[in-house]
Structures are given as structure tokens and as C-alpha cells.
């Protein structure tokens, strides 16, 4: 059924079984797209795999992040030990994102950040910054970010209780900031919001089928820690500090935190440093959440 067909009318050529979309002709006569959930180990290894996917015709890159990245901890943090580069790629700074998407035409592929919106905000901004370095305006970048934070609080208590970063209220605020930011700066970036009409969001629904791989590689953790050490040695400390102060002020007030967050990441603040500022202001969730 398409919106144009009207209620009670048959849909052609998208008749059951085998619907290929909500609007005729959608993908009739074209191969069904395949988007592989990818990202494992070091950024260089993930980049090599992304290049293979693009060379084979993939137009979308769903990026898997490791647990420390999803939690907002840098790879050299003690809490990250043993988890760096496992079940996803480790991203700590803009340098990592440059390597991850090096040689990837971001104007021609979409990027799906397999991380909740409250955790995906810095990675969304890092994608924007790297895209702009490639000469791709933010308005041309396409991708998606998840936003099912309430489901996360219900399920992660039993599945992955350490994976959420903030209590529910500031988490919802951060998601709302992501929505507003994307609407203003990155209109082709897909977000999901409550209260939308089904006709508006249903045509943009997608599903992901994934398999599980487990890899233990201490060398990845060591290499990532070395990258962070070099980054902190050469960056402008005062610029980073000033940007993080502005982020803290925004978090304490009502301004959209994504704008100062972008400035901090552009100044080579790490994802963990950004998250530490927000944790200082917003706190962390209790086990009672």
C-alpha cells in the first residue's frame, strides 16, 4: 500500500508477497540493497574492509563501535581494558574517524551509526567534520543514528547494564538536541522521533540482520593507546580546554550541546573527554534506573 494508492486499493507492482517498499515502483527491477554491519579491531583494519564493501557496490556503511566507544570512554581508560576493538571499531578522536573514512567517498555512501543517539552524538559530529574535510557539505551527508534510549534502559539492565552513559532525563535532552541539530545542519541524516505520523516515518524504516563475531587482540588496545598519547602530545591544550568549558556551560544551561561538542571534537578533544564533561554535569545512571 502506498500513500498515493489510497485505502483499500491494490498496490502495483509492490503486491504481496515480497514487498520491496512503500511507494511504487521503489526497487522493482533493481537488486535489493545489502548493508553489512561492519567495523572490528583497529580503524585501519575497518577502513580496509569498508573499501572492499564500497568496491563491491555497497552504498551504505553501518558502523559497529566497540563497547568503550559506546560508553564514552577513551581506549586508554582503565575501564576499557580488554574491550578495545572487540565487537566494533575503537574511535577516540577525529584522527580515528579520518582513518576510518579515508578514501571513502562520503558524498556517495550513507553511514549508519550503530549506536544510540545519546552515545552517537560525537560520532555524528566527527562524520560531519571528516565529510567537510573531504569537501562534502553537511547538508549532503546521508546516514542514520539510532534513538531508542528508552528501550535501552529497559533491556540493558539485563543485557549490557554498563552501556548507558547518563540518566534518562539528560539522555532524552541529548537526543532532542541531535534531532534539532540534524534538522538544521544535516537534513539528509535520518533520525527517529516520537509523535511522527506513520506515513512520515514508515517509508524510512530499515532492518538489520547481524551475526556475532568475537575477537581478542591486545595489540589493538596498545596501538589505540599509543595513538591517544601522540594526539594529546601535539594538540593545542588551551583550545581543547576552552572548547570543553563551552560544552560544560551548554550542558548546564538549555543550549544545544552539539554545537560546542563539535568545536571540542574539531579541537582534538577525545570522545572520552567530551563524555566526562557531560557526566560531570548530568551524572551517571543509578542501578535503580
Where in this protein do the model-derived segments appear?
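Catalytic alpha/beta active-site cores
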Residues: 1-208, 287
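Generic surface-pattern signal
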Residues: 55, 180, 233, 249-252, ...
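Generic structural signal for hydrophobic core residues of well-folded globular domains
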Residues: 104, 182, 251, 264, ...
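Residue-level signal for alpha-helical context at structural boundaries
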Residues: 115-118, 145, 261, 265, ...
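Catalytic-core signal marking the mid-to-C-terminal active-site face
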Residues: 206-265, 270-271, 277
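Long, highly charged low-complexity segments enriched in Glu/Asp and Lys/Arg with interspersed Ser/Thr
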Residues: 275-289
